[in-house]
Amino acid sequence: HWPLLAPSPYHKMYNQSDVIGVVKDEVEKKNPHPVFSAFQQLEYSQNYTDEKKRRHVIPTYMGLISEIDHHIGRLISFLDTNNLSENTVIIFTSDHGDYLGDHWLGEKDLFHEPSIRIPLIIVDPNMPKNLRGSSERRMVESVDIVPTIVETMGGSYASNRMEGPSILLLA
């Protein structure tokens, strides 16, 4: 979210040459649905569709992601150092992605890939070795996380009381 401010050294890790192009087409602006048009007119969408602003801001966004990676590494090092890794399940996710100018939009508003495809990383020391480091392309939702935690911890839940299924079934 704006303002994108990254502390040192992350604010200088990337530069404008690291920014990839946007996914957008003039067709998306010609006769858009009124809702789509309204989101395109929002200030943050306008900021991301200004290529000069976009190329200035996205390296900071990338730096913030690197900062998160660094702190996840610190957490894992702490768990390893204190012999807690074998008894700790780590779940890392985000609430939404960001358009970063794709489809003439900024932030999260609608349901294109940049907005809905988010990281979901699960590190479970009890996971079978053949599944470690694997990637899953099937869609899961945030509501699937709580049932997954309950099942991972050996508990049970009434499926009519929780909206999502455990994603352990995907394994």
Regions found by a protein language model. Name each.
Residues H1-N87, I91-M139, T152-R161:
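Active-site-proximal cap/lid insertion segments
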Residues G164-A171:
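Short, intrinsically disordered, charge-balanced linker/junction segments flanking boundaries
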Residues S142, V146:
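Zinc-coordinating Cys/His ligand positions in small cysteine/histidine-rich zinc-finger domains
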